Curated annotation (Swiss-Prot):
Residue sites binding heme per the record: H132, H154
Protein name as catalogued: Acyl-lipid (9-3)-desaturase
Subcellular location: Membrane
Any one of the GO CC terms: membrane
Pfam families named among the record's database cross-references: Cyt-b5 (PF00173), FA_desaturase (PF00487)
InterPro entries in the record: Cyt_B5-like_heme/steroid-bd, Cyt_B5-like_heme/steroid_sf, FA_desaturase_dom, Fatty_acid_desaturase
Membrane-protein topology: Multi-pass membrane protein
Keyword Transmembrane: yes
Enzyme class: oxidoreductase
């Protein structure tokens, strides 16, 4: 059980099922392979689209289903061949494990020569990185210990594929950080306590609430045609879009159903059809954010696209220092004044980039049909509601207000979670990276509902597949872990979070003013 003080009252990580060993047992893995082939065949081409459509700068989806599909089925020849015949298998050739130090592994951090560490074992993924179903997000952990990010985002069947790239064992000069050990023990404890299991009735209730919101919005303009009614209906539609955004987020993190392909199906319905954004585009962007929140490279070029907002917004003085244009500096001097207004255009930006994603020539015909077809259904129902029920220019007013309202409601919650927190260009372990870059907003009936559970953003980043209704249960244990290891657990009111975001923007704006004067 979980102790009140946030520690472990019994058991440890060693007492749990070893998923790595389980996944490599022939009987179990064969069963999982057959099951995955039967239930999830449809999503493989979409999974591999994520990999092909990423660049070295912008990494891709590290979603659980992508890893599961790559292990469970082998219809893609280049993947199966590379897994079957990896270049390096030193442990087989030498008949005994080779040992490596952290320094040895760190020297192999290039796309053509890349090693990673997972559970004290070293893997040479040089021949696999380009074919990684999750895309180039794997690049962010070249030469590093990827134990926690791998365990957090991958299905148990993904352990099987690792065995083909095993080249030896890690020998540490120093022991693993106690922080990481205790984080792993907490994760094992939460697994035993069934906290990764979702309440289907909870999600049914959330769905019904959303249906009632959209039904009310449509009913208002069905009965009344005044501009007051149009504005009220549009505002409710914006709220509906925001709340459906949280639902799609839950499904696409595989929080709801135990079967990953079913989460994906519902995620596509809510994401593409209801909301009109490309799920593939979103995963490409969002899962990299989870792997490298607020992280930049050595030159302070953002790795996390969520902070790649120049030339309009600069989230730190280090990012500001990369700006050379005097015109940009003049704009940035006022970023704290126009920022909240800018949030209203967030959804329009996401719709634009989603549409642009579907035009990429790398997409196969099937991928184009899936993305464009489901997104087209969104525009059909959304425009039909507006133009069928409203006369004159009122449909345009209704749609514009809906988009602006939903953009603000979504964007406002997002910026509270990470903006105004540390932006860094140094290597951090998984746990330190999540906590340093993330802020919680205090729990409460309204906050929990309005933010879709993302007010517990620290907990979500540490355990992204945990259903939102369990995040408040684990927050005392996460806070205890942070305090024990001297980490700042930022848990503030919504007003305080807003103030901290705006203060950061103002501080950077002042620095932009000084920088512009110095350049004159």
């Amino acid at each position: 059980m979980v102790s009140q003080g946030g520690g472990l009252s019994q058991g440890s990580i060693e007492e749990n099922i070893d998923v790595e060993h389980l996944a490599t047992m022939p009987l179990v893995s064969d069963f999982l392979n057959v099951l995955g082939t039967t239930l999830g065949q449809w999503s493989l081409s979409t999974t591999f689209a994520f990999k092909r459509l990423t660049t070295k700068k912008h990494s891709s989806d590290i979603s659980v289903e992508a890893q599961k599909e790559s292990v469970a089925r082998g219809p893609v020849e280049n993947i199966s061949q590379s897994v079957a015949q990896p270049i390096r298998r030193r442990w087989v050739q030498d008949k005994k494990p080779v040992t490596y130090s952290l320094k040895d592994v760190a020297s192999h951090d290039m796309p053509q020569d890349c090693w990673i560490i997972i559970k004290e074992k070293v893997y040479d993924v040089s021949t696999f990185a380009e074919q990684h179903p999750g895309g180039t997000v794997i690049n962010t952990y070249f030469g590093r210990d990827a134990t926690d990010v791998f365990s957090t985002f991958h299905a148990s069947t993904s352990w099987k594929i690792l065995q083909n790239f095993y080249i030896g064992n890690l020998v540490r000069e120093e022991p693993t950080l106690e922080l990481l050990k205790e984080y792993r023990e907490l994760r094992a404890l939460f697994l035993r306590e069934q906290l990764f299991k979702s309440s289907k009735s909870y999600y049914l209730f959330k769905t019904l609430i959303n249906v009632s919101i959209v039904a009310t919005s449509i009913a208002i303009i069905s009965l009344y045609k005044s501009y007051r009614a149009v504005l009220l209906s549009a505002s409710l539609m914006g709220l509906f879009i925001q709340q459906c955004g949280w639902l799609s987020h839950d499904f696409l993190h595989h929080q709801v159903f135990e079967t990953r392909w079913l989460n994906d199906v519902v995620g596509y319905v809510v994401g593409n059809v209801v909301l009109g954004f490309s799920v593939s585009w979103w995963k490409t962007k969002h899962n990299l954010h989870h792997a490298a929140p607020n992280e930049c490279d050595q030159k302070y070029t953002p790795i996390d696209e969520d902070i790649d907002t120049l030339p309009i917004i600069a989230w730190s003085k280090d990012l500001l220092a990369t700006v050379e244009s005097k015109t940009m500096l003049r704009v940035l001097q006022y970023q704290h004044l126009f920022f909240l207004v800018l949030l209203t255009f967030a959804r329009a930006s996401w719709l634009f980039w989603s549409a642009a994603f579907t035009l990429r020539p790398e997409l196969t015909l099937g991928e184009k049909l899936l993305e464009r077809g489901t997104m087209a259904l969104h525009y059909i129902w959304f425009n039909s509601v507006a133009f069928y029920l409203l006369p004159g220019w009122k449909p345009v007013v209704w749609m514009v207000v809906s988009e602006l309202m939903s953009g603000f409601l979504l964007g406002y919650v997002f910026v509270l979670s990470h903006n105004g927190m540390e932006v860094y260009n140094t290597s951090k372990d998984f746990v330190n990276a999540q906590i340093a870059s993330t802020r919680d907003i205090k729990a409460g009936v309204f906050n929990d509902w309005f933010t879709g559970g993302l007010n517990r953003q620290i907990e979500h980043h540490l355990f992204p597949t945990m259903p939102r209704h369990n995040l408040n249960k684990i927050s005392p244990h996460v806070e205890t872990l942070c305090k024990k290891h001297g980490l700042v657990y930022e848990d503030v009111s919504m007003a305080s979070g807003t103030y901290r975001v705006l203060k950061t923007l103002k501080d950077v704006a002042d620095a932009a003013s000084h920088q512009q004067l110095a350049a004159s």
